[in-house]
């Protein structure tokens, strides 16, 4: 943070070539390049969106060429999702600092043609990831700036009116939210890094009702996850303030049975080469599993590619703290 070291890399599946700092190469006249702290990435239509948290903006570029098209100014922006011609960006709203009086966060609606902000709705404290199911958006609120008074809710936004209609109590310090192909939501809690551990929660609709409720608590730590078919691949880098150390784990959960079916998706022992897992994605066609390694947080990281059976295929040096992956459709 504070060093404008956000970069964009590009891997070409056809040639096997990996290009570091792709954005700077394609946009040599952009001052300070991408900016400070890249926090999310997404593709919608022909455009690529990069959420740059501490530069308070979303950079927009052509998804195939990487040429810059413009930017959207949003304070302390976090994550981006897309729906019916609009981009939705979660925002902490307030400045980047721990503050027990930090304001509630918001979700901004952006026109993907003009890049104009069209609507805004207030949600919980320090909102993170979002998902949309049946014309409702679900937003994980962390309250991370208000430690130890974390938020514990998922905000529900009705997309037609763009109003918050409910807050679902789930767990403290929420972060990730992903939907599976059965429209269940998988939500992570980071816990309090002391006595309350990270957990994974399942939200589903009650029979005959249109409201989501917490149906299951999966007793695993989960920092991030990727879902393909009926398999949820996850890793955990669980920090403990008492021991000043991380506990790292990997696994696979069957989203239908909600059972842990494997304690690691890496099967050849090469997980020992990963220092700090920091991002995960599964290729939608090949099933290849990608894991990023942040290493020491200050120098180049590594991107690992594993087969769908968990065997290492290759690895490559990346920019600093690699974290977010998106696949460009053919």
What are these regions (language model features)?
Residues 1-330:
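Predominantly soluble domains enriched in secretory-pathway, periplasmic, or organellar proteins
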């Amino acid at each position: 943070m504070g060093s404008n070291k956000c970069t964009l890399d590009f891997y070409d599946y056809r040639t096997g070539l990996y290009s570091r700092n792709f954005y700077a190469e394609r946009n040599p006249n952009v001052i300070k390049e991408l900016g400070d702290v890249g926090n999310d990435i997404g593709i919608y239509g022909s455009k690529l969106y990069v959420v740059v948290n501490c530069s308070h903006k979303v950079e927009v570029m052509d998804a195939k060429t990487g040429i810059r098209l413009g930017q959207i100014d949003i304070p302390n922006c976090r994550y981006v999702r897309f729906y019916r011609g609009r981009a939705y960006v979660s925002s902490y709203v307030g400045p980047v600092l721990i503050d027990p009086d930090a304001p509630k966060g918001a979700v901004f609606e952006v026109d993907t043609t003009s890049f104009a902000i069209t609507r805004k709705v207030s949600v919980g404290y320090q909102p993170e990831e979002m998902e949309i199911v049946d014309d409702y958006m679900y937003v994980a609120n962390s309250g991370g700036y208000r430690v130890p008074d974390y938020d514990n809710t998922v905000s529900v936004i009705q997309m037609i009116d763009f109003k918050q209609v409910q807050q679902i109590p789930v767990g403290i310090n929420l972060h990730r939210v992903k939907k599976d192909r059965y429209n269940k939501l998988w939500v992570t809690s980071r816990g309090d890094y002391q006595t309350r551990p990270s957990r994974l929660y399942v939200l589903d609709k009650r029979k005959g009702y249109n409201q989501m409720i917490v149906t299951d608590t999966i007793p695993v730590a989960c920092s991030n996850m990727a879902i393909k078919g009926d398999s949820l691949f996850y890793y955990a880098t669980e920090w403990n303030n008492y021991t000043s150390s991380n506990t790292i784990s990997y696994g696979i959960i069957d989203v239908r049975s909600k059972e842990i079916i494997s304690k690691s998706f890496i099967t050849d022992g090469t997980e020992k080469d990963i220092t700090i897992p920091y991002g995960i994605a599964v290729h939608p066609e090949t099933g290849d599993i990608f894991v990023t390694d942040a290493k020491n947080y200050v120098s180049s990281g590594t991107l690992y590619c594993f087969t769908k059976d968990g065997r290492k295929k290759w690895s490559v040096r990346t920019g600093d703290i690699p974290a977010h992956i998106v696949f460009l459709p053919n």
